[in-house]
């Protein structure tokens, strides 16, 4: 009769300081299919170590161990996990059920790692529990089951993938006599159905129910009667094997790991929430700073554009503050005409200015009077509250008309609904109000000077008596590079004047400087937010490391029922990523709430959540989970199943 399990000269020793302590010494043993064997011995005799080797949880230091003729020493860890999963079923003294799972879910665990479809394994788990008399306890957690019921759940779990070999470690040690008798009756039934049952016990009454008693003392077998060949029922279920394609197995494995991770998180809600808190704050900070920062940036740039972007100012002299008399008359009307003819020019306006007294009735105020063309308001993107700008005829005829700014209108006409057509005195010259322009922000804040605009011909000839221009402002067509336009302007006027007696001021340079400044500030704030995200990630890693320590026995149970190291790694890594993703989702929700509140108190801000910002938050959460979950997951995957099961 060929042995199912065969040990030949097996020894097992463990390091203790500088010495090796031998626990098993030159063990040779054969166990045949369908036997019911009891391994007995006092505490410390080595019987549990022998069971761990038989169950492929441990490897011998020397000698060979064969399972169905296969030398276990030639198998890698994944192959050993497969062997445990497909051929062995473990029954533990303390049941080793996972507290956050129901009875049926505990029974399903071996099939999960075998990659069996959910519906199939749920059906089989219920059938096994029904067979063991637990049909009314299928959805109960272990805490609501008696000791005997928990042990029967443990037996059902051992049978889930077939359980060709049942390894029972003190199966009745934590039970009352009645429950113990029920468990032993079940084991005898399994023996009768063709299962190989190996019981490790120190109770002679339990051992007496086996067909063969192997006694071990001080690591050596002192009693090993020959196997009795008996005819058995061939009722052992075949090992459950997943035959689905590789990609489907991977998808199923990932889905189940995700489900188990969610259940583990739900089992410790408060700790999970506190773990997420750092991620929530970090993601909310990053998203809020990116989104609100972008809104602030757009608002600043919009304000700058409102002052007239794509504009180039031309002034006489070498630079601001140059009052050299030889440059004062550098800019002429002919220069304006030449500039207006350029194909890349949208519009151009001259400017002359002087302080004047403006009077209406008994109201007398000081204003800054600007002589400009009708294109001035287009150049600076200004709109009108009332009336309109002056036309070409008024410009040519040096018409006595004026456009007021909103502040001037308020000072002169505090109670009038419409001021177009009213006559005021500009100096000593009567002028007709033809429009009121909207207030425009200054680059340096709002000035306290009141502004009015007259046709530059009127201003030059009737008021100032000068033929030159104080400045020219050019609006470049959309799509034209302002730097190139500035170079062409410089080249044009230098050729006309024969020298460079002017300088230019490109508003786009202000825009670019503002963009650079806001980007730098936003980057700095984002880095601060990222630091909070890193702190949150470290919190996740810390809690996950604690979780690995707390759940060491759970890891050992999972490995005993067939989980590979990669399965454990995947599960804990997914848990970390899931914590970060849920925290990220809550962080995004928090940032949306912050944005909503900001819009209530800052109505001028347009805060929008772009797909890029949301995708970035998702990637940040995932990356944080992977980065800070890797170390705890790796530590969990590296645990030795025997050590893990022995932890309290």
Swiss-Prot record:
Its EC number is 7.6.2.-. The keyword Membrane applies. It is found in: Cell inner membrane. GO terms for biological process: response to antibiotic. ATP binds at residues 41-48. Disulfide bonds: none annotated. Keywords: Antibiotic resistance, ATP-binding, Cell inner membrane, Cell membrane, Membrane, Nucleotide-binding, Translocase, Transmembrane, Transmembrane helix, Transport. GO terms for molecular function: ATP binding; ATP hydrolysis activity; transmembrane transporter activity. It comes from Salmonella choleraesuis (strain SC-B67). It is a multi-pass membrane protein. Belongs to the ABC transporter superfamily. Macrolide exporter (TC 3.A.1.122) family. Its main location: membrane. This is Macrolide export ATP-binding/permease protein MacB. Signal peptide: none annotated. The chain crosses the membrane at residues 273-293, 417-437, 523-543, 577-597, 611-631.
């Amino acid at each position: 009769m060929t042995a199912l399990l065969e040990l030949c000269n097996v020894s097992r020793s463990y390091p203790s300081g500088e010495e090796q302590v031998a626990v098993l010494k030159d063990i040779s043993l054969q166990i045949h299919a369908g036997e019911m064997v009891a391994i007995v011995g006092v505490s410390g005799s080595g019987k549990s170590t022998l069971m761990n080797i038989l169950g492929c949880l441990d490897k011998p230091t020397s000698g060979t161990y064969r399972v169905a003729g296969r030398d276990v020493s030639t198998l890698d860890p994944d192959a050993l996990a497969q062997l445990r999963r497909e051929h062995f079923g473990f029954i533990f003294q303390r049941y080793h059920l996972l507290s956050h799972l129901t009875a049926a879910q505990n029974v399903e665990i071996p099939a999960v790692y075998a990659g069996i479809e959910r519906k199939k394994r749920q059906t089989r788990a219920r059938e096994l529990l029904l067979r063991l008399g637990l049909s009314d306890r299928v959805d109960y957690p272990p805490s609501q089951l008696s000791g005997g019921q928990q042990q029967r759940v443990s037996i059902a779990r051992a049978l889930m993938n077939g359980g060709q070999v049942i390894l029972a470690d003190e199966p009745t040690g934590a039970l009352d006599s009645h429950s113990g008798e029920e468990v032993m009756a079940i084991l005898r039934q399994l023996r009768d159905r063709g299962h190989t049952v190996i019981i490790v016990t120190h109770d002679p009454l339990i051992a007496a129910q086996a067909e063969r008693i192997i006694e071990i003392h001080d690591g050596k077998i002192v009693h090993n009667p020959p196997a009795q060949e008996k005819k058995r029922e061939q009722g052992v279920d075949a090992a459950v094997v997943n035959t689905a394609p590789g990609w489907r197995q991977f998808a199923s494995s990932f889905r189940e790991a995700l489900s188990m991770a969610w259940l583990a998180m739900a089992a410790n809600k408060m700790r999970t929430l506190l773990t997420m808190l750092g991620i929530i704050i970090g993601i909310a900070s990053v998203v809020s700073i990116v989104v609100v920062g972008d809104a602030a940036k757009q608002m600043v740039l919009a304000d700058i554009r409102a002052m007239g972007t794509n504009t180039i100012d031309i002034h006489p002299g070498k630079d601001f503050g140059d009052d050299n008399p030889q440059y004062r008359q550098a800019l002429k009307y002919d220069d304006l005409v030449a500039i207006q003819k350029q194909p890349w020019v949208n519009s151009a306006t001259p400017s002359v200015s002087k302080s004047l007294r403006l009077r209406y009735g008994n109201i007398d105020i000081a204003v800054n009077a600007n002589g400009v063309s009708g294109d001035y308001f287009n150049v600076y993107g200004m709109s009108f509250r009332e009336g309109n700008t002056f036309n070409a005829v008024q410009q040519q005829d040096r018409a006595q008309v004026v456009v007021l700014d909103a502040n001037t209108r308020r000072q002169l006409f505090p109670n009038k609904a419409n001021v177009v057509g009213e006559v005021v005195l500009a100096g000593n010259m009567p002028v007709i109000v033809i429009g009121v322009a909207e207030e425009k922000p200054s680059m340096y804040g709002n000035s306290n000077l009141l502004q009015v605009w007259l046709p530059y011909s009127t201003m030059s000839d009737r008021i100032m008596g000068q033929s030159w221009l104080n400045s020219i402002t050019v609006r470049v067509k959309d799509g034209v590079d302002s730097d190139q336009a500035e170079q062409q302007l410089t080249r044009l006027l230098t050729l006309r004047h024969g020298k460079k007696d002017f300088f230019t001021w490109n508003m786009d340079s202000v825009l670019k400087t503002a963009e650079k400044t806001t980007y730098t500030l936003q980057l700095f704030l984002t880095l601060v937010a990222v630091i909070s995200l890193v702190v949150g990630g470290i919190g996740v890693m810390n809690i996950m490391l604690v979780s690995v320590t707390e759940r060491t026995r759970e890891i050992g149970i999972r490995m005993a029922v067939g989980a590979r190291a990669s399965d454990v790694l995947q599960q804990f890594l997914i848990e970390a990523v899931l914590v970060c993703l849920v925290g990220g989702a809550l962080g995004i929700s928090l940032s949306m709430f912050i944005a909503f509140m900001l819009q209530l108190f800052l109505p001028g801000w347009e805060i929008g959540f772009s797909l890029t910002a949301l995708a970035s938050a998702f990637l940040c959460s995932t990356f944080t989970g992977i980065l800070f979950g890797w170390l705890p997951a790796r530590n969990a995957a590296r645990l030795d199943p025997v050590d893990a099961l022995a932890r309290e």
